[in-house]
Every structure is written in structure tokens, then in C-alpha cells.
Amino acid sequence: MSEDFYDVLGVSRDATEDEIMQAYRDQVSEYHPDVSDDPDAEEKFKKIQKAKDVLTDEETRQQYDQLGHERFEEAEKRGATGNGGGGAGGMGGAGGPFGGGMGGGAGGGMGDIFEQFFGGAGGGGGRGRSGPEQGRDLRTDLTVTLSEAYRGVSKQVTVRRPESCADCGGSGYPEDADVRTCPQCDGQGVVTQVRQTPLGRVQQRQECSRCGGEGELHSETCSTCGGQGQTRERATLTVDIPEGIRTGQTLRMDGEGAPGEPGAPNGDLLVDVTVEEHPDFERDGDDLHHRHAVSFPQAVFGAEIEVPTLDGAATFDLDAGTQSGETFRLKGKGMPRLRRRGNGDLYVTVQVVTPESLSDEQRDALEQFAEAGGEEIDVEQGFFEKLKNSF
């Protein structure tokens, strides 16, 4: 039974990526075959490398935690884990005529089978690498106010991301380290394996696991990055928020993700945007909704009403006899349409406010108003209470 990856590195199951990388560096400095006298150093180093690769990849680590060590290794042999390429689907998958682990995934077919037999690095259904690997994408969150989403704004975000190691220039070893030809691949960077298949004996070329395809070994690794060529650093970047951005939308910053392998581009930084709620406006797509209080006389006689917008005050005509709850539309006073021309609308719902207290003169006037309309006034309740209870 092989050893659990967390135990290999000596970390807890809830260890952070930084803790895992630190444990990896400590183990590498002790068991790297080029610096260790331990006769089992090479085998231990492979285990350490494998444990680090699995536990520092978010998707693969999640699969590992869900499956457990033994089931994960079985799935990996079949090519069913996150970085292993195709799974059990397609021709030659689990239960297929060519046995487990050779499927190209759903939609694989004969091309994947012959690629597995005759070319490509790695096994278990994966495709061979055609060149340096692009850096992975990173994600971060950013919150903006509704006013900032209305006008557009430039904001700064700080992210922790891999950077090329400043001490070794990304090579993974010091400049003065001794160099020798890798004995496992004779300096070729690849090794050839002969396999017996249903089609006969075939040769498969794989990237050398000892030197990582470089064909050379170095007497020591960089103490700063543990031989990885990368360190995690904080980077402060400026994000341009376009007018009309909405919650849940994502902005892509090209080339601001993790660095790629030498000769390959960096990944991208994906910024997930959240727009804060506003105390005066409720957003509905590109439209805004606002509740506005008007007085009883304004509702009765009509008036020019001033309301706030995200671009300053605006006015509209309140019709005489307006009832509480009626809505008025102010065209073009809503949010800008993202990467399109024009704005949405502002919908103002009026709320007729009943005064909480009246002077004697105001009370007499309202009672006369009611009597003129033929309404009977309950002396005990009074017109004001009657009016207030009618809303």
C-alpha cells in the first residue's frame, strides 16, 4: 500500500498551499537524489514530487480528498483524474477490448488509441504534450459600488500568484550548481518504453521523470523556490471596470495569471465582480427602481417633483390626483448598457405621505374639504385619522 500524499509531505489535510510548498522544499532539500546519500532518495523524491503536484493543484486535490488515496491511484491509472486526460469512456475504456486505462474519454476513438501506443508523454489515456505548457488562470473577487458601476472606474486588486523565482531566474537551481548528464535518459530528456499491446510490441517515448525533460541534473536546487523556478508573490494590479457592469460578470486580464513554462504564455487573471446594493435604488438589469415620497397636496394638485439619479437630480411632472403606489418612467435615467449604446430607465414609484400632525388651521381646512365633498366626519375620530387610516 502506497503512502498517503499528506503523510509523504508531513502536513495536515487542511494545510494551505503555502504550507504544502514549504513542506515540499524541506523534503526536497533532504531527499533530492543529487544531494542525498540515502540509497532510497530517488524513490522518496519521486513520491515527494508526486505529492506536491497533486496537493497544489486545486482540482486534483479536490478529487484526491473525495476519492481517498487508493481509489485516486486506481483512477489515475485509468486516466480518470483531473490531469490525466481521458477517462473510462470511449473505445478502449474500462471494460473495453483493450483493457482499462487506455480510453481517450467520451469521443476518443482510434486516433487516441494509436496516440497512446505510438506517441506522447505519460500514460493512462493522456495525450502527449506538444510543447511548453501555458500558465494556469487565476481568479480573484472585486466589489464595486452601484455608482462606480454606473460611471466605470479603475480599481486596484492585490493577488498572490506564482512568479518566476528572482534568485534563480526560473531555472530552479543556482548559477554555480554543477551540471551532469542525466543517467536515466542519457541526456535525451525522454525515455523509451517497450510495451506489449493487443497490436504487438510498441515503443512509447516519455518525458524523463528524473530530469523533467531537460537531459541534465544539477548538484543543488534553488533554496528559495525548492527547485520549482517559481515563488508566490503579492501583485497589485489595476482593473478597468466598464460602465454597466453587473454582479456575477467576470473580467479577464490577459497574461496576469500564473507564468507558463519557458516559451509558453502566462495564464489570465479572472476578476469576478460584485456590485453592492444601493440605499436609494434597486437594480433590475439596466433599469433602476426608486421609491419617492410626495405630500398629500402634491398628489392632489399635481407638482413638479425632483428625484435623485446616479447622474444628479432629475424632475418629472406628477399628475393631479396621483395615487400612492403609482409608477412614473424616466427614460434613459437608468444604468448604462454594458458595451452598448444608451441607458436603461428609472422607474419612480410614489408614496403619498400622510402628515403625522396637523395645525388647527390645517385640520379645519381638511374637514371643510371633506364636508364639501359630501363626506361625513366622525367627530371622535376626526378627518385626519380617517384620512390616515384610508392609506
UniProtKB/Swiss-Prot annotation:
- Could you name the domain of life of the organism this protein comes from? Archaea
Q: Which GO terms describe its cellular component?
A: cytoplasm
Q: Which InterPro entries match?
A: DnaJ, DnaJ_C, DnaJ_domain, HSP40/DnaJ_pept-bd, HSP_DnaJ_Cys-rich_dom, HSP_DnaJ_Cys-rich_dom_sf, J_dom_sf
The record ties this protein, via PROSITE patterns, to: DNAJ_2, ZF_CR
CXXCXGXG motif repeat residue numbers: 165-172, 182-189, 208-215, 222-229
Q: How is the cofactor bound?
A: Binds 2 Zn(2+) ions per monomer.
**Record's Pfam families?**
DnaJ, DnaJ_C, DnaJ_CXXCXGXG
Instruction: Look up keyword Cytoplasm and say if it applies.
Output: yes
Protein's GO biological process: chaperone cofactor-dependent protein refolding; DNA replication; protein refolding; response to heat
This chain belongs to the protein called Chaperone protein DnaJ
Question: Which species?
Answer: Halobacterium salinarum (strain ATCC 700922 / JCM 11081 / NRC-1) (Halobacterium halobium)
Give the classification, highest ranks.
Answer: Archaea, Methanobacteriati, Methanobacteriota, Stenosarchaea group, Halobacteria
